[in-house]
């Protein structure tokens, strides 16, 4: 591998005023066991770990003091989220509680508008983001690929966005490639992390090839037959997609073009003519 390729793989993810060595963020819910979560984290080396305050109770496998102690031991920055909130006020309150519990200004902002699709509430989301940003939070809003919504979130002070690929937990991959690619094209300087709906590593590679800055995963890893191996696969896929983007892929063509050029006559024609 050349020096150029090595530096491309090592290029950092920049969110707000911080730099991260990985472009993969990992959720911490629904793993078969705390040990499988710990092993998956070590396998993929994520930039951040998302944690829902509402799940941190002693009665859940991923809850309690032991879980929090394990996260601290891993040394990976924690990104609390407001999962399960259905209003701006509810999300605001939970974010404030998360700041106290996890001692961080980072928040993955979720305000759900529909129980069936878990689609973000496009009206409440900017309102909640604006209030939290005024309070000094570094807000990463879970949103759709809607360009107008994304611009509104930027207008209220968000400096990075997390559009979905598909509804949470479906594993369908990008259901609106046109919308995601258009969003990347129209917001070229904004950090964009695809959050929700990715199911297999090739989905991560695809969005990274489109120019997205990172991916956030949970169910695709936690519910895999081998979460540790899948975490490693997603890490490699994310790097591959990023490197492919930086390498400048060849343009698509409508007609075939020979990869081996033919210059002049075949050598046996030349020998025959000279005889």
Swiss-Prot record:
This protein's pathway: Cofactor biosynthesis; thiamine diphosphate biosynthesis
GO terms under biological process: thiamine diphosphate biosynthetic process
Catalytic activity: [ThiS sulfur-carrier protein]-C-terminal-Gly-aminoethanethioate + 2-iminoacetate + 1-deoxy-D-xylulose 5-phosphate = [ThiS sulfur-carrier protein]-C-terminal Gly-Gly + 2-[(2R,5Z)-2-carboxy-4-methylthiazol-5(2H)-ylidene]ethyl phosphate + 2 H2O + H(+)
Subcellular location: Cytoplasm
EC number(s) recorded for this UniProt protein: 2.8.1.10
First-listed, main subcellular location of the protein, grouped into a coarse class: cytoplasm
Active-site residues, record numbering mapped to chain: 108 (schiff-base intermediate with dxp)
One Pfam family this sequence matches: ThiG
UniProt binding sites for 1-deoxy-D-xylulose 5-phosphate: 169, 196-197, 218-219
Keywords: Cytoplasm, Schiff base, Thiamine biosynthesis, Transferase
InterPro entries found in the cross-reference section: Aldolase_TIM, Thiazole_synthase_ThiG, ThiG
Enzyme class, first EC level, given as a word: transferase
Alphabetized GO MF terms: thiazole synthase activity
Any single GO CC term annotated in Swiss-Prot or TrEMBL for this entry: cytoplasm
Signal peptide feature range: none
Subunit and interaction comment: Homotetramer. Forms heterodimers with either ThiH or ThiS.
Purpose of the protein: Catalyzes the rearrangement of 1-deoxy-D-xylulose 5-phosphate (DXP) to produce the thiazole phosphate moiety of thiamine. Sulfur is provided by the thiocarboxylate moiety of the carrier protein ThiS. In vitro, sulfur can be provided by H(2)S.
Family: Belongs to the ThiG family.
Protein's name according to its UniProt entry: Thiazole synthase
Taxon lineage: Bacteria, Pseudomonadati, Pseudomonadota, Betaproteobacteria, Burkholderiales
Gene behind the chain: thiG
């Amino acid at each position: 591998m050349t020096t150029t390729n090595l530096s491309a793989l090592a290029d950092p993810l920049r969110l707000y005023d911080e730099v991260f060595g990985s472009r993969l963020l990992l959720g911490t819910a629904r793993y078969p066991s705390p040990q499988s979560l710990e092993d998956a984290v070590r396998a993929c080396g994520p930039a951040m770990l998302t944690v829902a305050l509402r799940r941190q109770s002693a009665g859940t496998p991923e809850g309690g003091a032991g879980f929090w102690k394990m996260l601290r031991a891993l040394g990976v920055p924690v990104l609390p989220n407001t999962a399960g909130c259905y209003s701006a006020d509810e999300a605001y309150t939970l974010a404030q509680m998360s700041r106290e519990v996890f001692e961080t200004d980072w928040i993955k902002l979720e305000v759900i508008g529909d129980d069936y699709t878990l689609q973000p509430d496009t009206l409440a989301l900017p309102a909640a983001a604006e209030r939290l940003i005024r309070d000094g939070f570094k807000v990463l809003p879970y949103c759709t690929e809607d360009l107008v919504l994304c611009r509104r979130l930027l207008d209220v002070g968000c400096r990075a966005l997390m559009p979905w690929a598909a509804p949470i937990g479906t594993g369908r991959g990008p259901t609106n490639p046109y919308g995601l690619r258009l969003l990347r094209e129209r917001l070229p300087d904004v950090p964009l992390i695809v959050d929700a709906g990715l199911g297999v590593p090739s989905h991560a590679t695809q969005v990274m090839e489109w120019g997205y800055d990172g991916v956030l995963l949970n169910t695709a890893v936690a519910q895999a037959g081998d979460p540790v191996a899948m975490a490693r696969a997603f890490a490699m896929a994310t790097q591959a997609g990023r490197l492919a983007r930086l390498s400048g892929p060849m343009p698509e063509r409508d007609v075939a073009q020979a990869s081996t050029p033919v210059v002049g006559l075949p050598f046996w024609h030349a020998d025959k003519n000279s005889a």
